[in-house]
């Protein structure tokens, strides 16, 4: 071991060098990029045979609708799915990472994944980043211990509830659940209630919109109902599209030449000496 490596004092687990750099750049006039507001409505509930998850399909970039039919219900394991709200890249990256870890665990043990295992992996990862990973999740699944539903916040805190909502449209969706949820719901009653909660978020929140996706998870079976409901169908003025007059439209009557005629005269003479 070299003497230089021994003389270096040990550092802590977190470095604030980049924070100081960003503060210095801001003082010199650099405008830091602003955060874009995100919008989503994701929900979940437990019914008598399993778990039902639901989500809208609108993705936004501030005031712009970036995608009208994106998927917000992510695969975690054959018996576990997860709805994501927040930054789309963060939710997809986090769920894909944990999904791969669950698959390796199944290969190692030969057993089905448990919902609490996925919950622990997600909350530990999000807590380590102190909320800078913008992923708010609703995790649901059915394992050997029964149906489970959890919410995971970007800072790593979790809740275990019989019904849950997250996202910018969560208050509107929660009002539907609190008014109509009851224990022992059937599959059809649960799907209807989840769809109504998502529609409430779609119609009362500008960040939510487009269609309704639903995922039903029971013991040994899952059913992904893509575009189960389309409360805002895309309509046109004419079913045949736009039509134009069948003739040439006169745009200009005055013609302006681009260049005037220029005469070029060739001058005879001796070449210049170098």
From Swiss-Prot:
The active site is at residue 40. GO terms for cellular component: nucleus; plastid; proteasome complex; proteasome core complex, beta-subunit complex. It holds the Pfam family Proteasome. It is found in: Cytoplasm; Nucleus. It comes from the Eukaryota. InterPro entries: Ntn_hydrolases_N, Pept_T1A_subB, Proteasome_bsu_CS, Proteasome_sua/b, Proteasome_suB-type. It catalyses: Cleavage of peptide bonds with very broad specificity. Residues 1-37 form a propeptide. The keyword Lyase does not apply. One of its GO terms (biological process) is proteolysis involved in protein catabolic process. The keyword Ligase does not apply. Its EC number is 3.4.25.1. PANTHER family: METALLOPROTEASE TLDD, PROTEASOME SUBUNIT BETA TYPE-7. Component of the 20S core complex of the 26S proteasome. The 26S proteasome is composed of a core protease (CP), known as the 20S proteasome, capped at one or both ends by the 19S regulatory particle (RP/PA700). The 20S proteasome core is composed of 28 subunits that are arranged in four stacked rings, resulting in a barrel-shaped structure. The two end rings are each formed by seven alpha subunits, and the two central rings are each formed by seven beta subunits. The catalytic chamber with the active sites is on the inside of the barrel. This is Proteasome subunit beta type-7-B. It comes from Arabidopsis thaliana.
């Amino acid at each position: 071991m070299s003497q230089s490596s021994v003389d270096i004092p040990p550092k802590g687990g977190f470095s604030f060098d980049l924070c100081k750099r960003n503060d210095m750049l801001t003082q010199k006039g650099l405008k830091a990029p602003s955060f874009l507001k995100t919008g989503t409505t994701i929900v979940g509930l437990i019914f008598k045979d399993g778990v039902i998850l639901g989500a809208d399909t609108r993705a936004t970039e501030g005031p712009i609708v970036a995608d009208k039919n994106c998927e917000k219900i992510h695969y975690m394991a054959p018996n576990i799915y997860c709805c994501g709200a927040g930054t789309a890249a963060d939710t997809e990256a986090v769920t894909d990472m944990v999904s791969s870890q669950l698959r390796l665990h199944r290969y190692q043990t030969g057993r089905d994944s448990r919902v609490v295992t996925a919950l622990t992996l997600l909350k530990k990862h999000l807590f380590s980043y102190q909320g800078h990973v913008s992923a708010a999740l609703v995790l649901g699944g059915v394992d050997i211990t029964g149906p489970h539903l959890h919410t995971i916040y970007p800072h790593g805190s979790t809740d275990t509830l019989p019904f849950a909502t997250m996202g910018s449209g969560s208050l509107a969706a929660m009002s539907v659940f609190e008014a109509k949820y009851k224990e022992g719901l059937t599959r059809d009653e649960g799907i209807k209630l989840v769809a109504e909660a998502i529609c409430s978020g779609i119609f009362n929140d500008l960040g939510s919109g487009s269609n309704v996706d639903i995922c039903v998870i029971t013991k040994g079976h899952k059913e992904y109902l893509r575009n189960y409901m389309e409360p805002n169908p895309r309509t046109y003025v004419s079913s045949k599209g736009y039509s134009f007059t069948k003739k040439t439209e006169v745009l200009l009557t005055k013609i302006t030449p681009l260049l005037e005629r220029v005469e070029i005269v060739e001058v005879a003479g001796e070449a210049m000496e170098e």
